[in-house]
Structures are given as structure tokens and as C-alpha cells.
Amino acid sequence: MKQESASQSTPPPSLSPAPSSAQPSWGDGDPQALWIFGYGSLVWKPDFAYSDSRVGFVRGYSRRFWQGDTFHRGSDKMPGRVVTLLEDREGCTWGVAYQVRGEQVNEALKYLNVREAVLGGYDTKEVTFYPQDTPDQPLTALAYVATPQNPGYLGPAPEEVIATQILACRGFSGHNLEYLLRLADFMQLCGPQAQDEHLEAIVDAVGTLLPCSYLPEQPLALT
């Protein structure tokens, strides 16, 4: 059985961190703009209007399937497993940052408050986001993070146990397995520099448990 490690998501070796003189900015200098970092379902299903989006990563965090979900990908009787961010000095988590401007800001935050906070149990946190194409120009972004203090938090478990739980759960947004595989699909599209050993181990465990392949109805594509 694979031992859990907080630093399984390795930083991309080909991308160096921003020099100390580079200060993250909130909306490319626009005081009415905001970046929102998604690392779970937001990477393929933001469902809010935005002006720009960039693929990239945040340092100092690892992604873990440690948050329980009783609405989107599970139920009260059978909570699904969705991701949160774990503070990890050596960690690196890939995702998508969306820029919202003007009226989009309030609309996006109102929508995400229900989707992520009320229904998901997530709190907001400020993170530094490094765009894949311009890692020397970091951005300050808002991320939704589930902490151990929220009632839906499930915490660590062996990847095989997490995989079994994911295979059994479904919520109002669909099957928990779809969530897992779409996230894995996104990571493959990011390229070989994007690694997440925790995610990969769960996908491998699902492949062992599942007798046939499961494919999402609509393939994911980065635009």
C-alpha cells in the first residue's frame, strides 16, 4: 500500500519560480478585476462569466481528495470525495485561473459562495498563481480551500479506499468518478511538467477496481 506523502505533487522542473523582485498583482493592475484559481471542478466547469483564463500552478500546496461532498458528487448517506489544498512547502498544484472584471466580480463571487462555500464547505484563501506561459509574472488569486474545521472534511485515507468511495458515489452534478477522470484529463492536457502522484494513484486504483473503462460524455479541452 502506498504511503501518503504531503509532497507528492512535484514542482515542474522546467519552470523556475518568479524572482524576488516580481510582485504578484490582482488584475493586471485593474482595481476592478479579480483572479479566481480553480484546481478541481472549476478547471472544466466554471459556470460563471469571465474575461480571461490561464493554465498554471500555485506553489506551497498539494491537492488531496480529502473533502467530503454530500451535494455535487455524493449524498448525506454516501459522501463523495473531492479535492482541497493542503499546505505543503514542496508542493505544486496545477489548475486554471479565471479573471473576472467589473460586474463579473460580484456575479462570480455570489455564485461561487453558494457552490463552493454553502454547498461545499470551502473557505477563501489568497494564493500566488504562476501562469504556465509567463511564470515570471505571478498573479494574486482567490482560491476556495476546505480545511479540517469544516464538518464535511474527511481527511486522509489510502488511495485504494478513496477510489472505492469515488466509485460508489453520485450527486446532483454527476458521478464522483467523472469528477476524478476529468481532473486527470486536465492534468494530461497540461503536459508532462504537471505531476500529481496522489491523483494518479487514485486513478490507478480505480483502474484496478473497475472492470471496464469509464469515459466522460464530453472530452475536456483547454482553450
From Swiss-Prot:
Free-text tissue specificity from the UniProt record: Widely expressed, with high expression in forebrain and anterior spinal cord. Expressed at intermediate level in the dorsal aorta and heart. Present throughout adult brain (at protein level).
GO aspect biological process, one term: negative regulation of Notch signaling pathway
Binding residues for substrate: I36, F37, G38, Y39, G40, S41
Main localization, broad class: cytoplasm
Region (Disordered): 1-26
CDD domains: GGCT_like (cd06661)
Molecular function as annotated in GO: glutathione specific gamma-glutamylcyclotransferase activity; Notch binding
Transmembrane segments: none
Location in the cell: Cytoplasm, Cytosol; Golgi apparatus, trans-Golgi network
UniProtKB keywords: Apoptosis, Cytoplasm, Golgi apparatus, Lyase, Neurogenesis, Notch signaling pathway, Unfolded protein response
Function noted in UniProt: Catalyzes the cleavage of glutathione into 5-oxo-L-proline and a Cys-Gly dipeptide. Acts specifically on glutathione, but not on other gamma-glutamyl peptides. Glutathione depletion is an important factor for apoptosis initiation and execution. Acts as a pro-apoptotic component of the unfolded protein response pathway by mediating the pro-apoptotic effects of the ATF4-ATF3-DDIT3/CHOP cascade.
Name listed for the protein in its UniProt record: Glutathione-specific gamma-glutamylcyclotransferase 1
Organism: Mus musculus (Mouse)
Organism classification: Eukaryota, Metazoa, Chordata, Craniata, Vertebrata
Gene name of the encoded protein: Chac1
